[in-house]
Amino acid sequence: MNREGAPGKSPEEMYIQQKVRVLLMLRKMGSNLTASEEEFLRTYAGVVSSQLSQLPQHSIDQGAEDVVMAFSRSETEDRRQ
């Protein structure tokens, strides 16, 4: 996770944003989320909708390792901006 933070975002906001991204990626890779994880996504629906548009577009049958690497690259690009 990003320890450097982003200008204008609190550590809690960064945590929520990153957790939403991770949960969405897990769901996209076919993982079953727990009830508490699904509730977290419902609670932060606004963050979910903004993150969905930023997720890398990959086919569902793509290997999990490739999806994680794409996610890592997008995280690195986000930090550079």
From Swiss-Prot:
Any one of the GO BP annotations: anterior/posterior pattern specification
Annotated keywords: Cytoplasm, Nucleus, Phosphoprotein, Wnt signaling pathway
GO molecular function: armadillo repeat domain binding; beta-catenin binding; transcription coactivator binding; transcription regulator inhibitor activity
GO CC term (a single one): nucleus
Location(s) in or outside the cell: Cytoplasm; Nucleus
The organism's place on the tree of life at top rank: Eukaryota
Modified residues (Phosphoserine): S59
Tissue: Highly expressed in heart, brain, liver and skeletal muscle. Detected at low levels in kidney, testis and lung.
Record's keyword annotation contains Chloroplast: no
InterPro entries xrefs: ICAT_dom, ICAT_sf
Main location: cytoplasm
Family affiliation: Belongs to the CTNNBIP1 family.
UniProt xrefs under PANTHER family: BETA-CATENIN-INTERACTING PROTEIN 1 (PTHR47142:SF1)
Function (record text): Prevents the interaction between CTNNB1 and TCF family members, and acts as a negative regulator of the Wnt signaling pathway.
Record's subunit section: Binds CTNNB1.
Protein name (record): Beta-catenin-interacting protein 1
Gene assigned in the entry: Ctnnbip1
